[in-house]
Structures are given as structure tokens and as C-alpha cells.
Amino acid sequence: VQRIPLPPAPMLASAAPPPADTTGYCFEAKWDGIRLLARCAERVELFSRQATNLTTCFPEIVDALSAGLEGRTAILDGELVAFDHHARPNFQLIQRRLRAPRPGPRLLASVPLTFCVFDIIYLDGHDLTGHTYLQRRRMLDDLRLHKPPIVISPYWTGIGTDAMAEIMRGLGLEGYVLKHAHSTYQPGRRSAAWIKHVVRQRRPMVVGGFIPSAGTHRGGLGALLVGAYDTNGELRYCGHVGAGMTPRTRASLMERLSDLQQPLTPFAAPIPELRGARWVRPTVVVDIEYRQFTGRLRHPALKSVLIDADSSGISLPPEG
């Protein structure tokens, strides 16, 4: 019986500026999910990036790979993704599945998953890590595994970084990964041959409060509490923003917000318990950059304070 090795630690992409000339590179979508390696032999086993065995968590992926490979042996590398009703990846949905080591029919139906496969590092007794990216992709395509819940993640060539960023932003995806066409698979290495680039969204937000800073800068501005108006005209809390502010910006905002303080929150219920929060009249508008909105802003940062902006016209961003 052929012995299939356990999956190695996956190759990782570097966070670096994309090259000005992308000749010789291939673009892939950056999925907002969890890295998954599939060891496909007599039975299929699934492993996380940290080598945790997740086989029982995702039985639909196991069944689909068993049927699709028809007895062939392989180690596949990809991303496990949960898509919301807008067809956009939603990381919170995957978290629900991870909390259930043996999901029941109801959870399987309510949170379906997709395994987006983007690499193959072993096939029918052959180690493919020394093959080039394009060679491995052709072998992966030849397996014809593209049947839900398995998707062969597409790749693109001959496109610029700005155009690719715009496409990813339009699709509501996290960003893209650039992979050199001649790169070999380097297990466990964060390689410069793969470059990840996160595409971020921008949106005006209304400041409804702030949290003073603690520690060395006690009494200064720690974080802004921001929100936007729903269709009923109520100000909804969207999150706190502490990144992206220079000392000068913090000082000028603190001076401005201090004059706008009021005893009651301007945000409609429910809002989380925000220790030390100070509330203000919702007249200041700021430009916020963020990765994703899921009812809360993910990885927000302040870009600028908008002068003379009408705070009443700031609506909630779409989720996803």
C-alpha cells in the first residue's frame, strides 16, 4: 500500500508592496477563510496551517474530495471559505463551524463551506514541491475537481495591480496574491516569490463618542467611537477606531470633541459596553479605511477628518 506523507507546513506569502512590473507573475484571489491542507489517500484527512486535524469538522469537504479524486492520491493546499448571502467570504461564519467538531445536519445546511484549492504538492507518489507554480497548477486543473463544494481557485496573468485591486474590491474580496510563475513550493517558508496584498474599503463615518487614552498619554484621545445611519434614520454603532492617527490629529480631534460632549449616547441600542466612553453630539465626520464590514468594522484606520461634511447623510456600508 502506498504511503502518503503527512502534509508539510504550507508555503506562506510575504506582505510586501507588489512589484511595478508584474510580468512573470500570476494573480490569485485572497480568500478570507482558513488555510486547509487535504491529505487524500484511502481516506481523506484535513489539516490546518498549524497541523491540527480538522477532518471531522468538515465532512462535506471530505466526501467531495473522496468522490472527486476517484482513488488517486494527492496533497492539496487551499483556503476553506464560508460565503454569505451576498456571495462574499465571511470569516465569522467559519468560526461557527470551527466550534463544532462534529457538525449536525442543521449546521451543515445553514453554514455551507467551499474549499478553494490553489495548489497541489503531492500526486500519485510524486513530490511536486520542486515543480514550478504553473506546472503544479496545470496538474491541479487536470484533476477536474471543480465541483461544489470544491472550487479550483482561478489565476490571472497579463493584468496590472491597480486593475486587479479594483476587481477584487468590486467582488468584495479581501485582496489578491501574486505568485511567480516559476516559483517552487517552499514548505513552511514565507517567501518573496508569493506576495499578498490586502485591498481595503473607504467610507465616511460619524463620530458619536471617544475613549480617552490610558497610560503614558492619559487624558488624550485613545479611540473614536464611530457609526452610520440606518434606513430608519437611527445612528448605529459600527466600531472603535484607534489606528491611523498622528499625535497632532489626536490632539486636534480631542479639542474638538471635548466641546461636543453630552451625557447620553447618540447611538441607537444595542451597543456593547464601552468602558470609559465619552459621548458627543454626532456632527464630526471622519474618513475610515477598513478591510470588511460585518456589522462591525474590521481593521479600521482613520484616513482623515472631513471638513464641513453633512453627518446626517452618512449611511451604513453594505455588509460582507
Regions found by a protein language model. Name each.
Residues 1-320:
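Catalytic cores of nucleic-acid ligases and guanylyltransferases
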